[in-house]
């Protein structure tokens, strides 16, 4: 970029130079060098890996729309702004486990069959700001045979990490879901909601939760 000093003002282009006005000054700069053309991107083998990555990531983004509905009531309450992006990343990690198809053609239903799937999904938090293990001091697991968690009572004053001193009420609710990613279908159930006031006393946790009729993930 250079400044034009002349008794007249120049605006426009001359060969490789562009004259323009900015902040009351007459300036000149060289035209930018042309980047990659549409034709080059479409035909050059250099860009094949980029295009395949884009195809797969777009595929995961579409599938994530249904995934985000599995426990939508909880996700909406969390209001965690990075949730959608983290779901896309999670599904892409699962997609990469498909070793049967070549890159650009891999499928989630194949990646979901890996033995380590439980480890990947169980440690995914919809609300990374307040993950379950940071909220409750007790270890919570879900028993699929009994259709409930391993806790039947809790002392909310001692067992809960309250976000602030003024907080005095806590809501407990369970949700279970099955996801058929191939058909973009899902089934989910929510339990009754248990609301407890903050107190140093043991309170019962009695959930009623319908069992799932479909089992595509296990």
Regions found by a protein language model. Give the residues of each.
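Long, polar/Ser/Thr-enriched low-complexity segments
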Residues: 1-128
């Amino acid at each position: 970029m250079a400044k034009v000093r002349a008794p007249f003002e120049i605006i426009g282009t001359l060969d490789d130079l562009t004259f323009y006005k900015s902040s009351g000054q007459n300036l000149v700069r060289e035209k930018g060098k042309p980047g990659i053309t549409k034709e080059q991107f479409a035909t050059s083998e250099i860009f094949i890996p980029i295009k395949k990555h884009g195809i797969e990531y777009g595929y995961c983004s579409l599938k994530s729309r249904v995934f985000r509905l599995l426990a939508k009531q909880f996700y909406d309450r969390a209001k965690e702004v990075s949730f959608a992006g983290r779901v896309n990343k999670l599904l892409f990690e699962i997609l990469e486990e498909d070793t049967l198809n070549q890159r650009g053609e891999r499928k989630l239903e194949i990646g979901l069959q890996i033995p380590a799937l439980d480890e990947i999904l169980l440690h995914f938090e919809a609300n990374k700001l307040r993950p379950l293990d940071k909220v409750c001091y007790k270890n919570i697991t879900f028993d699929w045979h009994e259709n409930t968690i391993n806790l039947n009572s809790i002392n909310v004053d001692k067992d809960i990490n309250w976000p602030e001193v003024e907080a005095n009420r806590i809501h407990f609710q369970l949700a279970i879901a099955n996801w058929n990613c191939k058909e973009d279908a899902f089934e989910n159930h929510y339990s009754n909601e248990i609301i407890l006031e903050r107190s140093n006393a043991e309170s019962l946790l009695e959930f009623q939760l319908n069992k799932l009729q479909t089992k595509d993930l296990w």
